[in-house]
C-alpha cells in the first residue's frame, strides 16, 4: 500500500512507522514540519515538509495525496495554549483540510488519531465507543478533539465512498517521547534532576491527586492498531488502552514510594496558579484531562481488529518514568530537547 502519514515524526507517528516497517512492503510518505534524519524508523520514508497551520499546506496535500491507498492523520498541536488561533488552524482547520484533500484525491481510506479525552465524564465502569463524545469539560484539548470528531462524522456520512476510522488511545507512552513530554508540559518548573530523584526512589512519599486513575498504551501498540485498521480497511471508532488501570498508589509503588493523597481541587488550583505565572506549560485543562477522562473498554479493537497490546499499562508507565528521568529523546526533531527549548509553540508533528 501507498500510505501517507501526517505528523509522521511525532509520538504516535513514530509508533506507526515502526509498525509499518516491521510489516514491510509499503510505500510510506511522511508529512511534517521538520523532516527527521534518515535513521530508523524514519529511513525509507519519503518526506515532505508541511505545516497544516500554513495555507500553503493545501498545495502540498494536493501534490502528495493522489494515488495514496490510505492517509493516517497524526497531527495535533498541544502548545502554545495561549495562542488559540494557532491551535485552531492546526487542529480543527488542519484536520478538516487533510480530510478534504483526501476526498479530492480519491483516497479510499482515512484514519484519524484522536484521544479518550473526546469523551464526556463517566463513572467508575469502563466506557465503550458509544459513550457521548462531548469532550472533557474545561479542556481545550478534549473540547477540540470532540469538535473535530463531530465534523469527521459529518464528513463520513457525506462521503460513503471513503472508509473513515478514528482511533481513541489513552495516554500514549514511549521512551523516545520522554524529553518532549517534559518540555511540552512540565518546563520550566519540573527539572529532570527532580524527576530522576523520584524515579530512583529517593522520595519516600509522593504527593499525588486523590482518585487519580490513568490508563497507558505504548506507541508501538498504537502503531500496531493502525496497521490492523489499514489492513482490514476498518471504519468507525476504536478505543485503545492497555490494562491495568494505573492508580496513584500504583505510580508511587513504581518508584518505591508511598502515595500521599492530595485533594484534586488543591492540585488544580496550584496548576492554574503556576500556569498563569508561566512556571508550568500544562494548564488546568490538562489536569482535567488526567483526572476526568474515563476508563475505556477496548473490546471492539480486540474483536474486530484482533488487537491486543503487547506492553501492559504498568510497563508503559515504567518506561515513560525511566525515560523522563534519563532525559530520553527520539531521533526526530520534534522528539529532541534541543529543538524544543526556547520555542514559542510545540506541535507533535
Please give the residue ranges for each predicted region.
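N-terminal Rossmann NAD(P)H-binding glycine-rich loop of SDR-like oxidoreductase domains
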Residues: 3-23
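Rossmann-fold cofactor-recognition segment
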Residues: 42-55
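NAD(P)H-binding glycine-rich loop region in Rossmannoid oxidoreductase-like domains
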Residues: 52-93, 101
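Glycine-rich NAD(P)-binding loop of the Rossmann-fold in SDR/ketoreductase-type enzymes
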Residues: 86-97, 143-144, 217
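Conserved Rossmann-fold NAD(P)-dependent oxidoreductase catalytic core, especially the SDR/UDP-sugar
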Residues: 93, 97-141
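NAD(P)-dependent short-chain dehydrogenase/reductase
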Residues: 162-213
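Mid/C-terminal beta-alpha module of Rossmann-like enzyme folds, strongest
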Residues: 213, 221-282, 298, 319, ...
Amino acid at each position: 500500500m501507498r500510505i501517507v502519514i501526517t505528523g509522521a515524526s511525532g509520538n504516535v507517528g513514530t509508533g506507526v512507522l515502526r509498525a509499518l516497517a516491521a510489516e514491510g512492503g509499503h510505500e510510506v510518505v511522511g508529512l511534517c514540519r521538520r523532516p527527521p534524519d534518515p535513521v530508523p524508523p524514519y529511513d525509507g520514508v519519503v518526506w515532505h515538509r508541511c505545516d497544516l497551520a500554513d495555507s500553503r499546506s493545501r498545495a502540498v496535500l494536493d501534490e502528495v495525496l493522489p494515488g495514496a491507498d490510505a492517509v493516517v492523520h497524526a497531527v495535533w498541536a498541544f502548545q502554545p495554549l495561549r495562542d488559540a488561533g494557532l491551535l485552531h488552524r492546526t487542529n480543527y482547520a488542519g484536520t478538516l483540510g487533510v480530510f478534504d484533500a483526501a476526498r479530492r484525491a480519491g483516497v479510499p481510506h482515512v484514519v484519524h488519531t484522536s484521544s479518550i479525552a473526546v469523551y464526556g465524564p463517566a463513572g467508575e465502569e469502563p466506557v465503550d465507543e458509544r459513550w457521548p463524545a462531548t469532550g472533557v469539560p474545561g479542556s481545550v484539548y478534549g473540547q477540540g478533539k470532540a469538535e473535530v470528531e463531530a465534523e469527521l462524522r459529518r464528513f463520513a456520512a457525506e462521503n460513503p465512498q471513503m472508509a473513515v476510522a478514528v482511533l481513541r488511545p489513552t495516554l500514549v507512552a514511549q521512551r523516545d517521547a520522554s524529553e518532549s513530554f517534559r518540555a511540552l508540559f512540565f518546563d520550566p518548573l519540573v527539572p529532570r534532576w527532580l524527576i530522576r530523584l523520584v524515579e530512583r526512589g529517593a522520595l519516600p512519599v509522593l504527593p499525588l491527586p486523590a482518585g487519580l486513575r490513568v490508563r497507558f498504551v505504548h506507541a508501538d501498540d498504537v502503531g500496531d492498531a493502525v496497521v490492523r485498521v489499514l489492513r482490514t480497511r476498518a471504519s468507525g471508532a476504536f478505543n485503545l488502552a492497555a490494562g491495568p488501570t494505573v492508580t496513584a498508589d500504583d505510580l508511587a509503588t513504581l518508584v518505591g514510594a508511598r502515595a500521599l493523597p492530595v485533594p484534586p481541587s488543591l492540585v488544580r488550583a496550584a496548576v492554574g496558579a503556576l500556569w498563569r505565572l508561566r512556571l508550568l506549560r500544562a494548564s488546568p485543562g490538562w489536569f482535567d484531562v488526567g483526572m476526568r477522562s474515563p476508563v475505556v473498554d477496548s473490546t471492539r479493537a480486540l474483536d474486530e481488529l484482533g488487537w491486543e497490546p503487547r506492553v501492559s499499562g504498568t510497563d508503559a508507565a515504567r518506561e515513560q518514568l525511566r525515560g523522563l528521568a534519563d532525559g530520553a529523546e527520539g531521533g526526530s526533531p520534534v522528539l529532541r530537547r534541543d529543538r524544543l527549548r526556547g520555542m514559542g509553540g510545540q506541535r507533535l508533528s
